Each structure stands twice: as structure tokens, then as C-alpha cells.
């Protein structure tokens, strides 16, 4: 009987402790949602190493490889490749690192994500061109979408959408997607968010048949396209709560557009929120999402994103 042959490496004690800590984190173990990340927590660096294949000594090399790949592809003269090179030209290495992290330090896949990022903007210019900062602010103040001021226990940014009071005549679907895109772009400047990702909570309490009938398949596809391969973001979970029976019709329109990876991260809870609260702590959720905090106030988040109202100018992106 021959001895089994294998390889192993000794895991440093500090690394073992950090991995153990990752299993017991609370919402208080993470940095702020808004603004830059001054210093990544040690357990988040360990998470980046374990989940994203990130090593401090290979970051610069990966960025350089992506820069070279962008130029090499642009040399082919292909239209999208040229658009990617133009988009990247004025951006720093921190911008490229977002894409590398989102694709676990696979430079080839990071480039494909860059192409998706640029193509989404070319495909849907109405979400990006000549936007009014004042209009964006008003949409975000109305809570479309919302953002929790605390990360969840996994360090993810939690985005909220409460459909009950939404009237498409007052706030259009495109205006909501414009706000989503603006928020994603802003919050992805934070390295902790790049590593830990996002979680989306959709509250469908009060969702009417009239609202369901007004949702066009083209709009729903645009929303799904935003979530898939168009941002250097890790969308880790999408939770639907309090949905009525006819929500199934809307969801069945969306499902064919979802890739299997994202589909597996969709959770439909109905009115039984026990499983939902195991993932998202009640003490960080507003009352209108079943939590213990006061009702969501979009003006607080808008001030974090835009500053005090007196300092805001009506300018274009």
C-alpha cells in the first residue's frame, strides 16, 4: 500500500485567526459606507486574499497587465475596444483595480468587465448623458433607491427599494436607474465596498396590479443589464420581501434575463422574514423594512452623497 502524496502549506496563526474572525463579524466590524476607505480592516484584507486572490505584491502587476491589454485590444481598431481605451485613458490605477477585484484578479475577465461597463453606457446613454445633479438628488431624497448608513455583518452595502409609494408619473423608471448608477459609481470608490460588495432589498408591500402592468420588459431588462457585467461590483444577494401573489408575473419576465450566478443569489421571502433577518440584522433596517430604526429618510443619504443643500449646484455629470 503506497503512501498518499500531496502538498500543503503551513497557515500562519494570524491568518487562521483572521479567517475565524470572518465567521463571527457584526455590523460594527466594518468601516463607513460613505466616503473613501482610510484603512481596510485586517479581516477584509484576508477576505480579499481568500475570495479574490488578492495579494499586495501583485496588485501593481495586475493593473499594468490590464493597461497593456487595453492598449493591445485597441490596436485592433475594433470600435468597442477603442471606446474602452478612451474611457480608461484619464483614469488612475485605482479605477482599474475595481475591475480586477470584481473578477478575482483574472486580468482577461477584468477586461471583459471593462468592455461591459463601457458597452452599457453606449447602449443606454439616457442613463448617463446630461444628467441634472438636482434631479438626481431629488430622486435619491425620495428613496429611489435607498442606502443604509451601516454595512451588514458581511461588510456589504445594503441598497433599498420600497415600491409602495412609487408612481412612475412622478419618478420614471429611467430616473430610478440613473440614481442607481450614480450611487454605484460613488460607493465603488470605497475599497471596502469593492471587496465586500452589495446586497439589495426590494420591499414589494403595497405593489399594485397597476404598477405591475406598467413595468415594461425593456425596462426590466435594462435593470438586469445594470446588475450583470456592467459595473465592477459584487452583487452578493437580492432579497424580495412582502411580495403579493401577482409578483410572480413580473418576476417571470425578469428571470430569463438573469444568468445562473445572479439567479442563485435571489431570495423571495414573502411575509415570512425569519430567513431574511438571519442575513440582514433588524437593528440596521428602518421600520418600513421590518427593522428597529426610524422610517427611511432619503434626505440623510442625499446629504452624504451631495453635501448640504446650500452647496449643491445644478450641473451635469
Swiss-Prot record:
Example of a GO biological process term: visual perception
InterPro entries, alphabetized: CRAL-TRIO_dom, CRAL-TRIO_dom_sf, CRAL/TRIO_N_dom, CRAL/TRIO_N_dom_sf
Keyword vocabulary terms for this entry: Acetylation, Cytoplasm, Retinol-binding, Sensory transduction, Transport, Vision
Organism: Mus musculus (Mouse)
GO terms of molecular function: 11-cis retinal binding; retinol binding
Record keyword Nucleus present: no
Protein's cellular compartments: Cytoplasm
Role according to the record: Soluble retinoid carrier essential the proper function of both rod and cone photoreceptors. Participates in the regeneration of active 11-cis-retinol and 11-cis-retinaldehyde, from the inactive 11-trans products of the rhodopsin photocycle and in the de novo synthesis of these retinoids from 11-trans metabolic precursors. The cycling of retinoids between photoreceptor and adjacent pigment epithelium cells is known as the 'visual cycle'.
Protein name per its UniProtKB record: Retinaldehyde-binding protein 1
Tissues expressing this chain: Retina and pineal gland. Expressed in Mueller cells (at protein level).
Binding of 11-cis-retinal, residues: 180, 202
Gene symbol of the encoding locus: Rlbp1
SMART domains, per the entry: CRAL_TRIO_N, SEC14
GO cellular component, one term: cytosol
Assembly and interaction partners: Interacts with DEGS1; the interaction increases synthesis of chromophore-precursors by DEGS1.
Residue numbers carrying N-acetylserine: 2
Domain spans labelled CRAL-TRIO: 136-297
Amino acid at each position: 500500500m503506497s503512501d498518499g502524496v500531496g502538498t500543503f502549506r503551513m497557515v500562519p496563526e494570524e491568518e487562521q485567526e483572521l479567517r475565524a474572525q470572518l465567521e463571527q463579524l457584526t455590523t460594527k466590524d466594518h468601516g463607513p459606507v460613505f466616503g473613501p476607505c482610510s484603512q481596510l480592516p485586517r479581516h477584509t484584507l484576508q477576505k480579499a486574499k481568500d475570495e479574490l486572490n488578492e495579494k499586495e505584491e501583485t496588485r501593481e502587476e495586475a493593473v499594468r497587465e490590464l493597461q497593456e491589454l487595453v492598449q493591445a485590444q485597441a490596436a485592433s481598431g475594433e470600435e468597442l475596444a477603442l471606446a474602452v481605451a478612451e474611457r480608461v485613458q484619464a483614469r488612475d490605477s485605482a479605477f482599474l483595480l475595481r475591475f480586477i477585484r470584481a473578477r478575482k484578479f483574472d486580468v482577461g475577465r477584468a477586461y471583459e468587465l471593462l468592455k461591459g461597463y463601457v458597452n452599457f453606457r453606449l447602449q443606454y446613454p439616457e442613463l448617463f448623458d446630461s444628467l441634472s445633479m438636482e434631479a438626481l438628488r431629488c430622486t435619491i431624497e425620495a428613496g429611489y433607491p435607498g442606502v443604509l448608513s451601516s454595512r451588514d455583518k458581511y461588510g456589504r452595502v445594503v441598497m433599498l427599494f420600497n415600491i409602495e409609494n412609487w408612481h412612475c408619473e412622478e419618478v420614471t423608471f429611467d430616473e430610478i436607474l440613473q440614481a442607481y448608477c450614480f450611487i454605484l459609481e460613488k460607493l465603488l470608490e470605497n475599497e471596502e465596498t469593492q471587496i465586500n460588495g452589495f446586497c439589495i432589498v426590494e420591499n414589494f408591500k403595497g405593489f399594485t396590479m397597476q404598477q405591475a402592468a406598467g413595468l415594461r420588459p425593456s425596462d426590466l431588462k435594462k435593470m438586469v443589464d445594470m446588475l450583470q457585467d456592467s459595473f465592477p461590483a459584487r452583487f452578493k444577494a437580492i432579497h424580495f420581501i412582502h411580495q403579493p401573489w401577482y409578483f410572480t408575473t413580473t418576476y417571470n419576465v425578469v428571470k430569463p434575463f438573469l444568468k445562473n450566478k445572479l439567479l442563485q443569489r435571489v431570495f423571495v421571502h414573502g411575509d415570512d422574514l425569519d430567513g431574511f433577518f438571519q442575513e440582514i440584522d433588524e437593528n440596521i433596517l428602518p421600520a418600513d423594512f421590518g427593522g428597529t430604526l426610524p422610517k427611511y429618510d432619503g434626505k440623510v443619504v442625499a446629504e452624504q452623497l451631495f453635501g448640504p443643500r446650500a452647496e449643491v449646484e445644478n450641473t451635469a455629470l
